[in-house]
Every structure is written in structure tokens, then in C-alpha cells.
Amino acid sequence: MSRLLPLLRSRTARSLRPGPAAAAAPRPPSWCCCGRGLLALAPPGGLPGGPRRLGTHPKKEPMEALNTAQGARDFIYSLHSTERSCLLKELHRFESIAIAQEKLEAPPPTPGQLRYVFIHNAIPFIGFGFLDNAIMIVAGTHIEMSIGIILGISTMAAAALGNLVSDLAGLGLAGYVEALASRLGLSIPDLTPKQVDMWQTRLSTHLGKAVGVTIGCILGMFPLIFFGGGEEDEKLETKS
């Protein structure tokens, strides 16, 4: 950190990249995010008189996407060491194939390949949608019939709490759903790097995810079969 502080003092709060007007512009205090809080590095003359902005993104500036250096860095830091190693190997392999086929004209994906891409992306999201909707319905119903009667919360509030439980469960079950989908024997579609970047492939990918989530959410409504109207009538009688 002691080596980075002189460099951070020479950068503005908006960017760490040198610009053409960086030398002529005055140097406002920089902000250093140290994990536990924000540390203001004020210039020798004292603190500025203007308002201070907390955070690394100024107002109305969008968050960094994955196609930027900051977004890619944030994504890499969120991975485990084994995941980073596997990602690095696959990136090297993918780039070597892309360089070898750079001058070759890649044909568009065939309808069979597009169908395979569609199915490959739809199956995991069927599991995601199924678990999300089923857990939300079961948790929301039990919350409404237990805590809802005691505290007198509405049905929408119970559904919101059920959605909270479903989201928390999804954080831990996402890896198991992906592992189960990989055991079905669906390997990665055999496409060249140029074919992966074509609009037909991306369209099939997004359609597969959308259809998979839709089917999964519809299948996840099956707990409604076991919840009849008697429980609702009992709740209304208890409230009255």
C-alpha cells in the first residue's frame, strides 16, 4: 500500500488513467478504497471546500461492465483459485484457436448446432426456475400461515419474505443445479470462436435461457396443488 499511495495521489477520483489534461488540471483529493472504509488522501494544503462523493463511481456513471478492465478485475477477484486456474487455461486455449482461425471464413452455425446451443442453455435454467418458484411458494405459504397470523402481515408481504428465502436458497443451490445439468451428458457445443460470437449463437443462447426459466417457473408451481382453500379460510377466521 505504501508503494501505491504516491501513485494514487497523482490520480483524480474519477479515473486512475492518465489523460491529456491531467497534468494541467488541479489535483483534488483522491479516494482510496481500503476494504474497511474510504480514506481521503487530502493535499498538503488541507481539505477541499466542495462536497465530497463517497465511492469510486461519480454520479450518473454506470457500473463497470465485464468488457472493461475494472469489470473484468472485479469478476476475477470474485472467483476461487481453482476457478481462476481453469478460466485461465480455457482462455489460453480459446485464444490460440481464435488466432489459428483468424484468417479463415467461418460459416454460420447450422440449425442442428443452434438447437444444441438452445437446449444446452435451457436445461440449467429449468432447474433454476423450478427451485426458485417452488421454494418461494412453500416458504411464502408457511410464513403467511404462521408468522402472518401472529403479526398480521398481508399476503404480499408473506410472498416477499418467501421470495427472500428462495433467493437465499438459490445462492447455495446454484452450483448443485449446474453440476446436475452437466451430469446429463450435454457437453459444450462444438463451435469455433467466430461462430460463438455470431448473432445466431447469441440469440439461441438467450432464447434457451428465457424458455428454460419459463418452463421451470411453471413446473415450480406444483406446490399449489397441495395448498387448498381451507387454509385461507382458516386464516381469515383467525384474523376475524
UniProtKB/Swiss-Prot annotation:
Q: Where does the record place it?
A: Cell membrane; Mitochondrion inner membrane
State if Thylakoid is listed as a keyword: no
Q: How does it sit in the membrane?
A: Multi-pass membrane protein
Q: InterPro entries of this UniProt entry?
A: TMEM65
The chain's Extracellular topological domains, given as residue ranges, are: 132-142, 231-240
Spans traversing the lipid bilayer: 111-131, 143-165, 210-230
Q: Where is the transit peptide?
A: 1-61
Quote the tissue specificity entry.
Predominantly expressed the ventricular tissue (at protein level).
Quaternary state and partners of this protein?
Answer: Monomer. Homodimer. Interacts with GJA1. Interacts weakly with DSP. Interacts with SCN1B.
Q: What does this protein do?
A: Essential for maintaining proper cardiac intercalated disk (ICD) structure and function as well as cardiac conduction velocity in the heart. Its association with SCN1B is required for stabilizing the perinexus in the ICD and for localization of GJA1 and SCN5A to the ICD. May regulate the function of the gap junction protein GJA1 and may contribute to the stability and proper localization of GJA1 to cardiac intercalated disk thereby regulating gap junction communication. May also play a role in the regulation of mitochondrial respiration and mitochondrial DNA copy number maintenance.
The identity of this protein, by name, is: Transmembrane protein 65
